[in-house]
């Protein structure tokens, strides 16, 4: 009886091996599901990027407004009747009095 139980246990393990570790096993299916979810997320991101690029291409093909806007911001274009004005942040104020030398450079006065 003990031999039959051992044989059935080994047979059960032999049947379970492909289910868990085989080509179509649960572990492989679980890994594939993670890969599919990751790829679906990447596809959604790329779809949004493509829609944005498609809109830019459409604007560039149909009108000069997009081209003019791009030239103004990226190349600094101005029209003939316009003037170019650039705002610059003010420089930080420096103190008028010179800074004293560091303590290591000051002479030691001993009395």
From Swiss-Prot:
GO-annotated cellular components: cell division site; cell septum; plasma membrane
Cytoplasmic side: 1-3
Coiled-coil regions listed: 28-64
Alphabetically ordered keywords of this record: Cell cycle, Cell division, Cell inner membrane, Cell membrane, Coiled coil, Membrane, Transmembrane, Transmembrane helix
Topology with respect to the bilayer: Single-pass type II membrane protein
Cleavable signal peptide: none
Chain segments carrying region Disordered: 90-111
Membrane-spanning segments: 4-21
Keyword NAD: no
Keyword Cell cycle assigned: yes
Function (record text): Essential cell division protein. May link together the upstream cell division proteins, which are predominantly cytoplasmic, with the downstream cell division proteins, which are predominantly periplasmic.
Family per record: Belongs to the FtsB family.
Protein name listed in UniProt: Cell division protein FtsB
The species this protein was found in: Ralstonia nicotianae (strain ATCC BAA-1114 / GMI1000) (Ralstonia solanacearum)
């Amino acid at each position: 009886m003990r031999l039959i139980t051992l044989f059935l246990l080994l047979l059960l393990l032999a049947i379970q091996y492909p289910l868990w570790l085989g080509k179509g096993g649960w572990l492989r299916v679980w890994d594939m599901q993670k890969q599919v979810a990751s790829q679906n997320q990447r596809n959604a991101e790329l779809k949004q990027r493509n829609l944005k690029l498609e809109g830019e291409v459409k604007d560039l093909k149909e009108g000069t407004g997009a081209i003019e806007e791009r030239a103004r911001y990226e190349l600094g274009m101005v029209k003939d009747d316009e003037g170019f004005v650039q705002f610059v942040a003010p420089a930080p104020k420096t103190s008028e009095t010179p800074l004293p030398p560091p303590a290591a450079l000051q002479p030691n006065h001993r009395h």
